[in-house]
């Protein structure tokens, strides 16, 4: 699925332009001189992105530890299509330049000219980027900008399991709250149960962080028993222990797949399309709140409390979007949803046509309480608040 299709339908006119603008997020400002230590990279004009075809693909794979391939349709003849493809190439060229010393390569696979190669490599979604590392293939579902792609690939280069060996690392682990995380306690790296945990981690790397400890003191603070694995849902303080330890790779993978949709989850640039595509029967409950803003912070804390109280409800999933993370999309969202993102908002969005209904807040200075939010969410889940009713009102 193409980048312009993922956050909504092709029929939404402003979306294509908004996401095209996002392509330039990673490009440097020309004419701005960086001081030593803050010298942003500028494209040096060297071609590093390879056109991968039947003749060279085997050699290309041998050359790089990690290879990112953009599977694309041939650009159309019109100027806009040609320009967009050139921009995408430049973004990949800059990322390739930055990561050249890390053993990361970039390539293009044409869906028409190189269809046979695409089939051999398992490339199925046109306008998607696939990342190859060893035996693993990762589909990149994030913002197409150089900085986000580079950050993602640096994470790919890291080991799939991070070890917790002391108090500071434990504190850093505990400070992670806005994403799913797992941690297990094992005897050593040679343990067969740790190997199973590591193999499972590779299945979700780098989207879901896996941690492990071999330190009994760390395990005691986490109340972990030997070969036990705890699963933390995003924004939840208490973990769920994967049952029936010791667990096989298959058991761990199945558990994560079953529980990976958190009650409250944050839309992030590196995984924005994956999150948006994971809708609930064609709708999303979406909350906008700036964490750095006092009202946004207060509203977010209320959302967390509601999510924690309703974590057992499989039908409830709220996507939190911090507008500060997506400045170029703010005007589009405000126009499409007819809302003011200078204040917190929560609503229901239809992913097919971007129709939406937003919670009415009686007093702009008085944010909704947890009880009021729960009542509103209950009405949404029961179908009393939905985007179809909003369409009927518009017709009237």
From Swiss-Prot:
Record-given protein name: Calsequestrin-1
Subcellular location: Endoplasmic reticulum; Sarcoplasmic reticulum; Sarcoplasmic reticulum lumen; Sarcoplasmic reticulum membrane
Signal peptide limits: 1-34
Modified residues (Phosphothreonine): 124
Pfam families, A to Z: Calsequestrin (PF01216)
GO MF annotations in UniProt: calcium ion binding; identical protein binding
Entry similarity comment: Belongs to the calsequestrin family.
GO cellular component: endoplasmic reticulum; mitochondrial matrix; mitochondrion; sarcoplasmic reticulum; sarcoplasmic reticulum lumen; sarcoplasmic reticulum membrane; smooth endoplasmic reticulum; T-tubule
UniProt KW keywords: Calcium, Disease variant, Endoplasmic reticulum, Glycoprotein, Membrane, Metal-binding, Mitochondrion, Muscle protein, Phosphoprotein, Sarcoplasmic reticulum, Signal
Changes after translation: N-glycosylated.
Primary location: endoplasmic reticulum
Mutation effect (residue 103 to D): In TAM1; increased calcium-dependent susceptibility to proteolytic degradation; decreased calcium-dependent aggregation; decreased calcium-dependent polymerization; no effect on subcellular localization; no effect on the subcellular localization of STIM1; decreased calcium content of intracellular stores; no effect of the ability to inhibit store-operated calcium entry (SOCE) activity; muscle fibers with the mutation have significantly decreased calcium-dependent sensitivity to caffeine
Disulfide bonds: none
């Amino acid at each position: 699925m193409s980048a312009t299709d993922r956050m909504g339908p092709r029929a939404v006119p402003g979306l294509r332009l908004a996401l095209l603008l996002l392509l330039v997020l990673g490009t440097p400002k020309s004419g701005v001189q960086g001081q030593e230590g803050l010298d942003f990279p500028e494209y040096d004009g060297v071609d590093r992105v390879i056109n991968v075809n039947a003749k060279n693909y085997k050699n290309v794979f041998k050359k790089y530890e990690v290879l990112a391939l953009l599977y694309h349709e041939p650009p159309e003849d019109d100027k806009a299509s040609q320009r967009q493809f050139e921009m995408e190439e430049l973004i990949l060229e800059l990322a390739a330049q930055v990561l050249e010393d890390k053993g990361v390569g970039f390539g293009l696979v044409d869906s028409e000219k190189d269809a046979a190669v695409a089939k051999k490599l398992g490339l199925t979604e046109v306008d998607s980027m696939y990342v190859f590392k060893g035996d693993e293939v990762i589909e990149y579902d994030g913002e197409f900008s150089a900085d986000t792609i580079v950050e993602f690939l640096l994470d790919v280069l890291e080991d799939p399991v991070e070890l917790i060996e002391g108090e500071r690392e434990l504190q850093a682990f505990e400070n992670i709250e806005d994403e799913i995380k797992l941690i297990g306690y094992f005897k050593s790296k040679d343990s067969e149960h740790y190997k199973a945990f590591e193999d499972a981690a590779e299945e979700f790397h780098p989207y879901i962080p896996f941690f492990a400890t071999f330190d009994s003191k760390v395990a005691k603070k986490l109340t972990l028993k030997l070969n036990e694995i705890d699963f933390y849902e995003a924004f939840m303080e208490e973990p769920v222990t994967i049952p029936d330890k010791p667990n096989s790779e298959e058991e761990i993978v199945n558990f994560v797949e079953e529980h990976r949709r958190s009650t409250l989850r944050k839309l992030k640039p590196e995984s924005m399309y994956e999150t948006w595509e994971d809708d609930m029967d064609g709708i999303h409950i979406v909350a906008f709140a700036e964490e750095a803003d006092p009202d946004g912070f207060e509203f977010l804390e209320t959302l967390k409390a509601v999510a924690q109280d309703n974590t057992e409800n499989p039908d409830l999933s709220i996507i939190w979007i911090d507008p500060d993370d997506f400045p170029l999309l703010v005007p589009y969202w405000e126009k499409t949803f007819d809302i003011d993102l200078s204040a917190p908002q929560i609503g229901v969005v239809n992913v097919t046509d971007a129709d939406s209904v937003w919670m009415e807040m009686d007093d702009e200075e008085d944010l909704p309480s947890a009880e009021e939010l729960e009542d509103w969410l209950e009405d949404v889940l029961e179908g009393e608040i939905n985007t179809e009713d909003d369409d009927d009102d518009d017709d009237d």
